[in-house]
Amino acid sequence: MKVLLAGAFGNLGADILKKLVADGHEVVAADMMERDLGIEKNYTFKKIDVTAPETLKGICDGCDTVITTVGLTKGSATVTPYEIDYQGNLNLLNEAKAAGVKNFTFISVIKADKAPHIPMLHAKAMFEEELKRADSLTLSTAPPAISMTSLRYSSR
């Protein structure tokens, strides 16, 4: 299976990348920069900036699945959670839909929709709502694990 993993070199993304590679998947590891994970480089690295849709053009072509761990994990003076967690993931979703990707998995947080006063959580909840409204996708959910939840969306 060909998988695009966005946010592949963050903490969670790196763990997912290692597992996908170990399981023998064809992986496109996309992030702003590549880092050494101490594994064989049995993946293709693509430099992206989810806030710049032009860097995403064609990134999902031929992929069966997109997994995104993209999101701010700490404060930033240059970007907001709405630009990354919401709009950036929406840019990626639009590219996945254009490429006819069958599955889209967004790694969010438990009860993001219950904390609208926290920008990072609110931005994630807003993107979850976009996924639910995506006209060419259907929703199925995976149970949460620890503090993360995976929302899986499959095309009809």
What are these regions (language model features)?
Residues 2, 64-65, 103:
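Structural motif
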Residues 3-25:
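N-terminal Rossmann NAD(P)H-binding glycine-rich loop of SDR-like oxidoreductase domains
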Residues 4, 28, 46:
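Conserved Rossmann-like nucleotide-binding pocket used by diverse enzymes
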Residues 14-16, 39, 77-78, 115-117, ...:
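Short glycine-/acidic-enriched loop or helix-start segments at secondary-structure transitions
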Residues 21-28, 32-42:
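A compact, surface-exposed functional segment
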Residues 26-28, 33, 79-142:
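Conserved Rossmann-fold NAD(P)-dependent oxidoreductase catalytic core, especially the SDR/UDP-sugar
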Residues 35-91, 95-99, 111-113:
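NAD(P)H-binding glycine-rich loop region in Rossmannoid oxidoreductase-like domains
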Residues 118, 141-156:
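Flexible, glycine-rich beta-alpha linker
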